[in-house]
């Protein structure tokens, strides 16, 4: 576990988020370290993919800002998504292996399962369960597959109560 750190007032600390999937880097992008308490790492970054991406239930686009919460002891990441002018769109939650921060790189392995929670909390959508089943993780690493499934259930339970905002508070 790396030591807790918090940028001093007026100073920011940069790092790189390296999101991998099935052993390959999916995307790498620079982010500003907001807080690191030794367990949870919070970063802020603009939408990093080229152009807009419409998921049907939300549209991510240039100018959006994501405040991303990663845990060293939990199997998920929660990304608060806001427009450039600060309007909350919702929370995109990735099921991941616990995050590792070393040498300025935050490494996160995406395990296919996702959860979307709308800004008003009215929509809670489980996503990509078919991709997860097709990934073969349950056969290769049953313990990880079980942890991922439990993490999705935990996040959904938090999202359907006031638990998600309490978790991020």
Where do the PLM segments sit?
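Short, well-ordered strand-loop elements centered on a beta-strand within folded domains, enriched
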Residues: 41-44, 87-94, 122-130
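Phosphate/ribose-recognition catalytic cores of enzymes acting on nucleotide-derived substrates
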Residues: 56-100, 106, 111-113
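A short, polar/proline- and glycine-enriched secondary-structure boundary/capping micro-motif
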Residues: 52-58, 103-104, 135-138
